[in-house]
Amino acid sequence: MDAVSWEYWSELGSGFVDAILLLVTGDPETWTIIRQSLVISITASVASVIPGVPIGAWVAVSSFPGRNLLIAAFNTGFGLPPVVVGLILSILLLRHGPLGGLNLRFTPPAMMVAQFILCLPIVINLTAVAVQQLNPKLRLQMRALGASRSQLMWLLGREIRLPLLGAYMAAFGAVVHEVGASQMVGGNLPGSTRVLTTAIVMETGMGHYDRAMACGIVLLLLVGVVAGLLTWVQQRDAYR
């Protein structure tokens, strides 16, 4: 191994050790970034479940003109580019824009709104799919017993509670690692709108690889936990 390679690997190893130390010793800046990421992404994903589950269930059990068009729109939203969401919200939140009076630009609530928009189609789609996969006789039986539409929605929700958990975890996983919308509407302000993904981009650009790697380690752990929970939900649901 030549001197250049040795120096490279030595610096990389030193940076990794420093990254672990930042996490273990409770570095205030690093843990503030972690906390902000979790607060913003959890709030946005939980909020998306409130309208997303009823809408998804309603679309699945209803028949009306334009239903397929609505489903296609939700499917399009499933792959909505975060940078496009960030661009649209940034324009709306400009000082003289339609929502400029709210003074939300470069604030955590603006990031929550952006992530909510990204989460909502995911929750709607996965809820609709879960309801459609139920035995049709179950819905007919509920209606025959006199269940109202609201009671029907509640009973269907109980039947698909594991897929609903999977829908939430998928939504959370989708936004916790996105960077485009968060950067554009949040501005990456320290102690306020700086989250794991935006911090990684900034710290890498500045050559602060220790903090960038610390944030990267936490982000990988979060994604790993989400993937593990999704796998558990899928396998448990498969053997019900």
Q: Each PLM stretch: what is its role?
A:
Residues 51, 74-82, 104-128, 158-166, ...:
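Faces of alpha-helical transmembrane segments in polytopic inner-membrane proteins
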Residues 3-21, 28, 85-117, 185-189:
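Membrane-interfacial helix termini and adjacent extracytoplasmic/periplasmic loops
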Residues 28-59, 168:
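Transmembrane alpha-helix signature in integral membrane proteins
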Residues 1-17, 64, 229-240:
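Transmembrane alpha-helical segments of polytopic membrane transport and secretion proteins
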Residues 121-139, 143-146, 150, 154-155, ...:
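C-terminal transmembrane helix and the adjacent membrane-cytosol boundary/short C-terminal tail
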Residues 25-28, 183-224, 228, 232:
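Interhelical loop and adjacent transmembrane-helix boundary motif
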Residues 65-70, 143-166:
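Amphipathic cytosolic juxtamembrane alpha-helices at the membrane-cytosol interface
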